[in-house]
Amino acid sequence: MKPMKTSWADEVEADYVDGLPPSKEYTQGNLKFVAEYKYNEDGKKVKVVRTYKIQKQTVPKVVARRRNWSKFGDSLLDKPGPCSQTTMVAEEVHMVFISSKELEQAQAQEPQVEPGKNIARCRICNGEHWSVNCPYKGTSMDSKTLMESKATAAAAAAVSDASKTGKYVSPFLKEGGCAIGGGIGIGAKPWVRERSAVRISNLSESMTEADLEELVKKIGPHTKLYLAREKNTGLCKGFAYVHFKFRQDAAAAIEILNGHGYDHLILCVEWSKPQP
């Protein structure tokens, strides 16, 4: 009895009943195609074809020899070069080697800073410190000229208003309250000192006496500063009182600081109300 003849497709399928067919590779021009077989999530046999673009480049001899090193472990039977299943190629990092002579020439071309010279210069007040450390950052007192002009205008307005009314002005209000001795001193009566006192509110909790003095010292001389603090925490309550020596300076402080920003807050400056 003659053996039954089978088709070549049945023979190929019979050879790989227990396994998957081997992968196949072929090239076409500058493209390389790799066909692989695997089982998908449903248990079905599928064919996966990967396409690679072949690029030729010149590499150093040590790099070429390193690519031909014998592999080991799970990659023992892999071909030379990286395998996509076990190796992931990251982006190339190009190194530039500079000799010490080129580095010295680059350093010689850099501008030299004179020793002992302060390179810090504030762009707000032109002081010898960085702008980030300027006490007048974010306020209307960013310019000394602007502050002086506002103070002069406020003082002139206060004097002109008093002269236009034609009413009687007591001696301690004339010339900024300097009828005797040139100003309102600490020993003056409380109701006299309150004529040149202002109340500054909406201050931050981190406000200190030093910050308050820095805020008002360029406006005019003052005789007393009071910063309200919490008893337990010692933090600022949000308001303070400043007693200026001259009334026109107090008016200038209201004109300059009221409604302007300080420490990310909008200040409210007004005349201090007499205590009952």
From Swiss-Prot:
Positions of the RRM domain: 196-274
Q: What gene name is listed for this protein? A: eIF3g2
Question: What does the UniProt record say this protein does?
Answer: RNA-binding component of the eukaryotic translation initiation factor 3 (eIF-3) complex, which is involved in protein synthesis of a specialized repertoire of mRNAs and, together with other initiation factors, stimulates binding of mRNA and methionyl-tRNAi to the 40S ribosome. The eIF-3 complex specifically targets and initiates translation of a subset of mRNAs involved in cell proliferation. This subunit can bind 18S rRNA.
How it assembles, according to the record, is: Component of the eukaryotic translation initiation factor 3 (eIF-3) complex. The eIF-3 complex interacts with pix.
Q: What are the subcellular locations of this protein? A: Cytoplasm
Q: Which organism is it from?
A: Drosophila persimilis (Fruit fly)
Q: Which GO terms describe its molecular function?
A: RNA binding; translation initiation factor activity
According to the UniProt record, one GO cellular component term is: eukaryotic translation initiation factor 3 complex
Q: What is its main location?
A: cytoplasm
Keyword terms: Cytoplasm, Initiation factor, Protein biosynthesis, RNA-binding
Under SUPFAM superfamilies, the record lists: RNA-binding domain, RBD
Tell me what this protein is called: Eukaryotic translation initiation factor 3 subunit G-2
Record carries keyword Protein biosynthesis? yes
Q: Which HAMAP family match?
A: eIF3g
One Pfam match, given by its short name, reads eIF3g
